[in-house]
Regions:
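Conserved glycine-rich cofactor-binding loop
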Residues: 8, 15-16
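Active-site helix of classical SDR
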Residues: 119, 153, 161
């Protein structure tokens, strides 16, 4: 219960889904946690549920002004960030021929540009031996129609993680990526489907998962805990898929 005792973690997009579940687990393991989110009401509600060792910052990962000012806001709370989980992301989908420049930019701005410059901005606060986690997707390896811009943005994240692992190895900062498969998170409610179509889509996806269920946010959080802690001290540049075996099927 004390794998992160004395550590401070920053989790972007920590007010819901995977980010919130990870914040809860990190707190259980002794960390102080700073979450970010773009909606003040959602961040406030999350902080109230997390307790006194959690802090919130209103910050939109797709807004470069917010990304640039985030390090200063973090420094008002802590001088050091032992763990950074660049988790904030969006999933905006359309057939390739119907993908607008706005949809393309929205995916890339949040999922890659925001991640890139969030890590760059907070890196001076990360001590030698720190841990950086990035959130990618199994869709990088297995194509799915309508996800071209989204999958490309997450593929860039995965490439970033491998590069940073080499660049930061001299400081013993480990950089690893998590690639979730079908996880029950609020992102599915933002796909623009009617409730009936969403249920049909979910059933079709679940049928293709060897473990025959959607994952829960806590399933991903457990992997984040492993990668953030000393339990994974000899892992860097790695990708861990959390997908119930989905990426191993034809």
């Amino acid at each position: 219960m004390n794998r992160l005792k004395g550590k401070t973690a920053v989790i972007t997009g920590g007010n819901s889904g995977i980010g919130l579940a990870t914040a809860q687990l990190f707190l259980e393991e002794g960390a102080r946690v700073i979450i970010t989110g773009r909606r003040a009401d959602a961040v406030k509600q999350a902080i109230e549920s997390l307790g006194s060792e959690a802090f919130g910052i209103i910050s939109d990962a797709g807004n470069m002004t917010d990304v640039r000012t985030l390090p200063g806001e973090v420094k008002k709370i802590t001088p050091q960030v032992d763990i950074l989980f660049a988790n904030a992301g969006v999933g905006l989908f359309a057939p390739f021929n119907e993908t607008s420049e706005d949809l393309f930019d929205s995916n890339l701005n949040v999922n890659f540009k925001g991640v890139f410059f969030t890590v760059q901005g907070l890196l001076p606060l990360i001590p030698n031996g720190g841990s950086i986690l990035l959130n990618s997707t199994i869709l990088v390896h297995s194509g799915l129609e309508t996800t071209a811009a989204y999958s490309a943005s997450k593929g860039a994240v995965l490439a970033l993680g491998k590069t940073l692992a080499i660049e930061l190895a001299s400081r013993k900062i480990r950089v690893n990526s998590i690639s979730p498969g079908p996880i029950s998170t609020p992102i599915y409610n933002k796909m623009g489907m009617t409730e009936d179509v969403l249920k049909e889509f979910a059933a079709a996806v679940q049928a293709k998962v060897p473990l025959k269920r959607f994952g829960e946010s806590r399933d991903v959080a457990q992997v984040a805990l492993f990668l953030a802690s000393d339990d994974s001290s000899f892992m860097t540049g790695s990708e861990v898929s959390v997908d119930g075996g989905k990426s191993k099927t034809f």
